[in-house]
Each structure stands twice: as structure tokens, then as C-alpha cells.
Design a protein with these regions (language model features):
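Alpha-helical segment of the N-proximal tetratricopeptide repeat
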Residues: 29-62, 69-85, 89, 110, ...
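Register position in tetratricopeptide repeats
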Residues: 42, 76, 114, 148, ...
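Canonical positions in the second alpha-helix
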Residues: 55-56, 89-94, 127-128, 162, ...
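Short coil turns that delineate tetratricopeptide repeat
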Residues: 61, 95, 99, 133, ...
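TPR alpha-solenoid repeat register
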Residues: 66, 100, 104, 138, ...
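Canonical tetratricopeptide repeat
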Residues: 69, 103, 107, 141, ...
Length: 348
């Protein structure tokens, strides 16, 4: 063997020894620093984590996870542009696994979203979905994006996909988007299209009350008071708390139609379904009082008080009904009771 051959052989042996003994130690050191970075992130010490991550990529430029974490921390610190630069540089690396590509696109979507570049954020999410079309995070990100952009058709479409991925049904969410779409059409003067959209919403979820509020309002504009009343009543029955806000609308529409007697029947239906609805109950008592049925009105209020002694609303209604028939000392006692309740509520 010639001297040059011997020298080459020695160099090869030295190189091999370097690879098998020194390289693993270097790799072990790099992973140890990366672990320190992750621990710092868990503690919330982002500055230390960032320092460790920078040390990692100096020692190992192929450590993609470290680059990803660096970019994510920079974004969280408010430096989305620097995060984009790091994350974007990873997209051209060859032979990346799908889960790494998914992480890159997710990070870029969040980067762009932070600086309100929504079109680019959407593009990254769509690239992610090409790798994993059932990715729940990506679909929910798109849903939030479409809601922000008030694109109700796409929001409805994505909502259906999410429900399929989650293996659940949420007709209320679909109905909500349809109602928002209908409201947009109404604002643009497309009344008939709005009504059709609201009707679809009602079929999608018959218990989503806002549909009927919108239908009632739109039929009022069309002066179709019969349909307006029907839909408002559905709203009031489904949403007793907010339904009281439209009692005056229903009364006015019934009076316009000359259907005075139906005001009493309307409040009776509300009270029958929800006996604790004091707003409807006092309205009904007022109607009975106006008809001269004083005793029936008083009996109605007293029945409500037997179930809820602390209702100031009911006590005031009883006081109103008692003014002309009760003795002064009885009225005084009743007023004292109301003052006591008011004082007690204020002290709480």
C-alpha cells in the first residue's frame, strides 16, 4: 500500500470516528438545549425559550421544530412579520412530513391573521386542508374568518363540515347563519329573498326564536299584519325574557286589525306556557281591568304573588288594582311591603 493510500485510509477512519462519537454528542447537546427551550415555554418564560431555540438552530440548521417554535413565540410577542419570515422559509424545505407541513401552514395562517392579511391566512388554511381535509382546527379557523367577513353562505357550508367531523348536529348554528344571511338581504331591499331565507331557517331549526322575530318585522314592513303577529307570537313563546319587548308591537297590530279581543287571548297563551312570566301576567291583568273585570285581574296578580312573594312588579300591580277598593291602612301596609323589598334588593 502506498503512502498516499495509507494517508487517505487514516483520514477516512478519523472521519468515521468523528461521525460516530462526536456527532451523537453534539446532537444530544442540541436536543438537551431544545428540551430546555420547551421547559421555558411551559413556564411562560418566552425570552429564555427564544434564546435556547436560537442556540439550537445555530448548532443544527435542520431542526425544523425549533424554527417553528421560534416563529410562534415571535408572533405571540407581537412580531408577526418576523414570524412569517421564519415560517415561510420552512415551506421550501424538501422531504418534510405531512404533520410538519400542517404545523407550518397553521403557524403561517396565525401569523397573517395577526396582521389582518385575511386572504393570505385563508390561503394557508386551505393548503393545510389539502393535506388533512378533516382538520378541525383549520375548519374552525375558516368558520371564524367567514363570520368576520360576514360571508354567511361559506359559514353555513363550513359549519356543516365541522359538524360532520365532530359527528354531531347543531341545527341552531345553521339557522343562525341563515337568519344573518336573511337580514343582509333585507337590508339590501331584497325582501322576498329574505323571507325565503328566513323560511329555510325556520325549517332547519323550528326552535331558533330569532327567525320569527325577523319574519314578524319583515311582514310588518309588507303590512301583512296577520303573518307579523303569528311570527311575533312564536318568538314571544320561545323567548319569554326578550319576548316582552314586542308585546306592544303585537297589541298595536291586533288593534290595527280590529281584533281587540285577541289581546287577552294572546297574553293568556303566554301565561299558560310560562306562569312565572310576570310581564305577560301584568299585561293580562291590565286588559282584564280595562274590561271591568277587576276581581279577575286582582285574583290573577294575587295568584302570582302566592308563587313569588318577592316580585316588586307583581306587588306594584296589586297596589294599582287595590287603590280604589282597599282601605288606607291596607294600602299603607302594602306600600311598606314594597319599600321593604326595594330596600332589601338595594342592600344586596
Amino acid at each position: 500500500m502506498t503512502w498516499p493510500s495509507i494517508i487517505i485510509l487514516i483520514l477516512v477512519i478519523i472521519g468515521g470516528l468523528t461521525f460516530f462519537y462526536i456527532q451523537p454528542k453534539q446532537q444530544a447537546k442540541t436536543e438537551s438545549i431544545y428540551t430546555d427551550a420547551l421547559n421555558a415555554m411551559v413556564r411562560g418564560d418566552k425570552r429564555t425559550a427564544l434564546k435556547h431555540l436560537r442556540d439550537v438552530v445555530k448548532q443544527d440548521t435542520n431542526h425544523v421544530d425549533a424554527y417553528l417554535q421560534m416563529g410562534d413565540i415571535l408572533r405571540e410577542e407581537g412580531n408577526a412579520l418576523a414570524a412569517i419570515k421564519i415560517h415561510q422559509s420552512l415551506t421550501v424545505r424538501p422531504n418534510l412530513k405531512n404533520d410538519v407541513k400542517i404545523h407550518i401552514h397553521r403557524s403561517l395562517a396565525l401569523d397573517y391573521n395577526q396582521i389582518s392579511q385575511l386572504a393570505k391566512a385563508r390561503r394557508e388554511v386551505e393548503l393545510l386542508l389539502k393535506l388533512d381535509k378533516k382538520n378541525l382546527w383549520a375548519n374552525e379557523f375558516l368558520l371564524a374568518l367567514f363570520e368576520k367577513q360576514q360571508d354567511w353562505d361559506k359559514a353555513t357550508q363550513i359549519s356543516k363540515i365541522i359538524q360532520k367531523v365532530k359527528q354531531l348536529q347543531d341545527p341552531t348554528q345553521i339557522a343562525r347563519f341563515l337568519v344573518l344571511k336573511g337580514m343582509d338581504k333585507h337590508e339590501k331591499g331584497k325582501v322576498d329573498e329574505a323571507i325565503k331565507t328566513f323560511d329555510i331557517a325556520a325549517k332547519t331549526d323550528p326552535n331558533y326564536e330569532k327567525t320569527y322575530l325577523c319574519l314578524g318585522d319583515i311582514y310588518l314592513v309588507k303590512r301583512d299584519l296577520v303573518k307579523a303577529i303569528d311570527n311575533w307570537e312564536k318568538y314571544a313563546l320561545l323567548n319569554p325574557e326578550n319576548g316582552k319587548m314586542i308585546y306592544s308591537k303585537i297589541e298595536a297590530a291586533l288593534f290595527d286589525l280590529g281584533r281587540f279581543s285577541e289581546v287577552e287571548k294572546f297574553y293568556e297563551r303566554i301565561v299558560d306556557k310560562d306562569p312565572s312570566n310576570l310581564s305577560a301576567l301584568t299585561k293580562l291583568a291590565n286588559v282584564l281591568e280595562e274590561k271591568g273585570e277587576h276581581n279577575s285581574a286582582l285574583s290573577l296578580v294575587e295568584d302570582a304573588l302566592s308563587k313569588n312573594q318577592t316580585s316588586i312588579h307583581a306587588h306594584l300591580m296589586k297596589l294599582k288594582l287595590s287603590v280604589q277598593v282597599s282601605k288606607p291602612n291596607e294600602l299603607s301596609n302594602h306600600i311598606d311591603k314594597i319599600i321593604q323589598l326595594l330596600t332589601s334588593n338595594n342592600e344586596k
